[in-house]
Amino acid sequence: MTRKSALIAGTAFAMASLALIANAATAQDQGQSYSADTVSIENFIGRVEIRTGDAAGVSVSITNPGGLVEDPQLRETGAGLAIDGGQSIRNLNCNVRNGVIRIGRRWSGQHEISEYPLLTITAPASLALQLRDAAFQGTAGDLGSLDLEMSSCGNFETGDIAHDVDVNINGSGDLTTRNIGGDVDIGINGSGDVVLGDVAGMMDVGINGSGDVRVADVTGHTDVGINGSGDVEFGNIAGLEIRISGSGEVEAHTMNGPFSARIGGSGDIAIQGGRAEPFEVSINGSGDVRFGGTAVNVTVRETGGGDVSIEEIEGSVDWRRNGRSVLRVGGTD
């Protein structure tokens, strides 16, 4: 063997040995179980799979098929586990084509999300999950609570969530959950879509743009604010307060409780039935409100080309259109 061949062979052996050591260390780290009530994922680009059930602790496996970025780092924080992807979410260029998410920097090429790191997490169903400053695609089983901030684009699906849900979407991210046992706070800045099952607590929805929210039944009071063309749809709902600036739409199957609506623009509200007490509407523009139930103690102010129709009215009525007194019952003048 020549001196050059020997050097090459020795170097190859050394590199192979280092790779074996590195792989062994990685496997050891990923095999560790953490005693954590909360998992926080931040500064992350990639995929997340969370398997929840009867697990006593939290374990994390990291695979990085594309090697585009460094592996995320794990750190214990009291009763929690922090996972830092080490990636800035600013200046991301993200799009979805044929169901495939592609992400890259504005000054560089895009890559399929499958080329970024994958986090596979096993945890108890009581897990409190936090996802912040992240662009990701993922799924989760049942959770204790969810605090989610999604940037640019992505999608996430979960099972039932026992307690509160806090969601902020900046861009075109999508979230789907099953039933929620606590309060829900949703903020969408862009075109994100949120689909929820039943909500046992109160609900607050804020949309700035063209985002859509669909919810089954809501037990508590709900507040909706739309600035733009966003749409919100409910099943059966308790008290409802709505503010629309633009062309947004709100629909519900039934509403039983206090009802208040303010429309500035061409927004529309349609509720098929229920009992609203009191019933208060103010329209400045061409928006319409249609209530197919019974409204009690009605106050209506219409300015512009807007229209309010109510199936039945009980109690007091204070109804004015462009400064003139109006009374309509059952959709007729």
Where are these regions (language model features)?
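Hydrophilic extracytoplasmic domains
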Residues: S266, G273, N284-D333
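Periodic glycine anchor positions in long extracellular repeat architectures
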Residues: G154, G171-G173, G190-G192, G209-G211, ...
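Gram-negative bacterial Sec-dependent N-terminal signal peptides
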Residues: M1-A24
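Eukaryotic tandem repeat interaction scaffolds
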Residues: G211-V213, T219-I271, P278
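Acidic (Asp/Glu) and glycine-rich low-complexity loops/linkers
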Residues: N23-N170, D174-I188, D193-G206, R214-A216, ...
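Structural beta-strand/beta-sheet cores of well-ordered domains, especially the beta-sheet scaffolds
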Residues: D37, G248, F279, V296-V298
